[in-house]
Regions:
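Nucleotide-activated sugar donor-binding and catalytic core shared by glycosyltransferases
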Residues: 1-381
């Protein structure tokens, strides 16, 4: 039974994917509980649902060990500010979304100040930094898992948790059919389309886009048309500078899901976009390249052999993964053409991706999260 008429929730979502995944959840919470106050860190989507931001969202978009080290002073200031905020504001709940490098520290801080913590999108302790599972156990009241296998792993450590479905099952919609998409962007419908997704962070774009552009040149322009996604989170001037002088490519700004659906093949930087593409059902090549130091440090601690989320969820080497030195134009073209020209391989990939879709869509976060929040309000409110 809900005991109060209004509740105050602290949020921390440090990345664009977390901002996206939190939007529908916030809307569902607002619809369910009505009088909620949302304060914290989040992007434009969360702000549309009523979040009052306390830091510029774009300051948090860093990736890799070296990049994080460069921003240590900023993150130290964030922790000081949040410590003061927690001591002055009466929060009924803290919802921390992914972003474990900072969020696990904030979870400990909130717990020490008697603010119950709900962790939405579990840290990938099963991949690396296994000690994070103990941080979850000590500081977090409940973990909402978005990958099917995480619930069982957490319960081994006596952590309150449940699998709530993956947010992409609710987020992915299509506004344009193939012909409308082609007309909107001036595409040649008679050709096969190959789509490149170089990333949603500036440092990703700097590393991945030049390699992807070189790979794109290898495809026969008479048979294939090359599409490049441009994330709204990426600095426009940086992106345009990197593609300056490139011919025979079409930049797709927005309509990512249509691009994924209507392309014959996708080449994607490792991340949420690979799971979105796999959920939609289009075969893809997964690529990843970090700074050399970040890669060396990461390789020492990573506990799994796969980096692509679709392969991890399926526990399979279904989709080709090109990492660091292997991520070069020749290998991208070779892996992509193998998928395009081998009907048996192509069919197998599509069948397995259909299974993945079923695994991720049997529950919905916008339905499950309000149940969890209600339970926490009733227990700790």
């Amino acid at each position: 039974m809900i005991r109060k008429n209004s509740y105050k929730i602290f949020w921390l979502a440090g990345e664009s994917s977390a901002d996206l995944h939190s939007e529908l959840v916030m809307k569902a919470l607002n619809d369910k509980f009505g009088n909620l106050t949302h304060i914290g860190i989040g992007g434009p989507r969360m702000q549309r649902q009523g979040l009052k931001p306390i830091f510029p969202f774009d300051k948090f978009a860093v990736m890799g060990f070296v990049e994080v080290v460069k921003h240590l002073i900023f993150f130290f200031k964030v922790q000081i500010r949040l410590s003061k905020l927690f001591s002055t504001e009466k929060f009924d709940l803290a919802i921390l979304v992914d972003y474990p490098g900072l969020n696990l520290r904030i979870a400990k801080m909130a717990d020490e100040m008697r603010i119950p913590v709900l962790y939405f999108i579990c840290p990938q302790f099963w991949a690396w930094k296994h000690n994070r599972v103990y941080q979850l156990r000590d500081s977090v009241r409940y973990v909402a898992c978005i990958l099917p296998f995480e619930e069982e792993l957490l319960k081994i450590h006596n952590i309150n948790c449940s699998y709530i479905g993956h947010p992409i099952a609710e987020e992915i919609t299509f506004e344009l059919d193939r012909d409308s998409f082609a007309r909107f962007f001036g595409l040649d419908s008679s050709k096969k389309w190959i789509g490149f997704f170089p990333g949603s962070r500036n440092n990703e774009i700097t590393k991945m886009l030049p390699v992807f552009l070189q790979a794109a040149k290898k495809w026969n322009q008479n048979e294939y048309q090359i599409l490049f996604s441009k994330s709204h989170n990426v600095n426009h001037q940086l992106y345009m500078h990197l593609i300056e002088g490139q011919k025979d490519i079409i930049i797709i700004d927005g309509y990512n899901y249509e691009m994924m659906k209507y392309c014959e093949l996708l080449v994607c930087t490792s991340g949420t976009v690979t799971l979105e593409a796999a959920y939609i059902g289009t075969p893809l090549v997964i690529c990843y390249k970090a700074s050399y130091l970040s890669y060396l440090i990461g390789r020492k601690f990573v506990r799994i052999k796969r980096i692509g989320l679709p392969n991890i969820v399926l526990d399979s080497d279904l989709l080709p993964e090109l990492i660091q030195g292997e991520m070069n134009p020749a290998n991208i073209y070779k892996a992509g053409m193998q998928i395009l020209t081998d009907p048996e391989m192509n069919t197998k990939i599509r069948k397995e991706l259909f299974k993945l879709r079923a695994m991720l869509s049997n529950k919905h976060p916008s339905i499950e999260m309000p149940k969890i929040v209600r339970h926490l309000f009733e227990t700790y409110g």
